[in-house]
Amino acid sequence: MKSKEEILRRAIILLAFSDRCALEKEMVDGVRRSLDEREMQRKAIVNWLMRMGYYDNISLKEKQVFEKEIARKADKDILVFQNNYECFEPMLVCLGLVKELSGYDKFVLDDFHPVLNFGKNHSFATLLERCCMISDVQIETYREISMLWYWRCLECRNRISNSTDIKEAIYNIFGENHISLLHNYSQFDAVANDFILNGKTVTELNNAEVERLSVISERRLYAFEWLTTDEEWDEVDLVC
């Protein structure tokens, strides 16, 4: 399990990384920005990370993106990294800075800059004092639920279990403990025998909805796997 300090530091870096990735597009926070303005902002983000003492903790992949100058043509590979925004809530929930994890039915769009006090008055020590870690049991439960969502997407897309009985498949693959997790979980319908999003079972979702759910569940599971293991950020291996 990662320490409170490690989790908070990683969340801060991820938010700065998300800001950098967003600069690949001309529209930033609803305002059209010139190439020079976006490059200036990229440098400002890097300087802020260095000044606050976070730059030494960024991963190799992140460093390559932070140090890549903004070009006229958007880098699609960098834009894909914006999916990491789904990693924020798992970390902030574990730190006690956000009350609960959002449902899996839509992307998280909340602005976490105020939560992490981004800006000139930012203080890691002050933020750390505000953090109150939830229990290991709660974290493990969140992780296992995210894993089941991730598995359900894989099953839906690839028919891994070749079964229409989702609970039976979960029992056969993961065991009784994972069935018990679903008993009081609001996004699992025992009658429909499936996870529910926006009133539809996963089986009823169209391709775009399944793809969105895949991104949400995969990124959240990635965050929880990092939280609960000794793996470095770029080296987390997802196994279902």
Residues covered by each model-derived region:
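Extended, charge-rich alpha-helical interface modules
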Residues: M1-C240
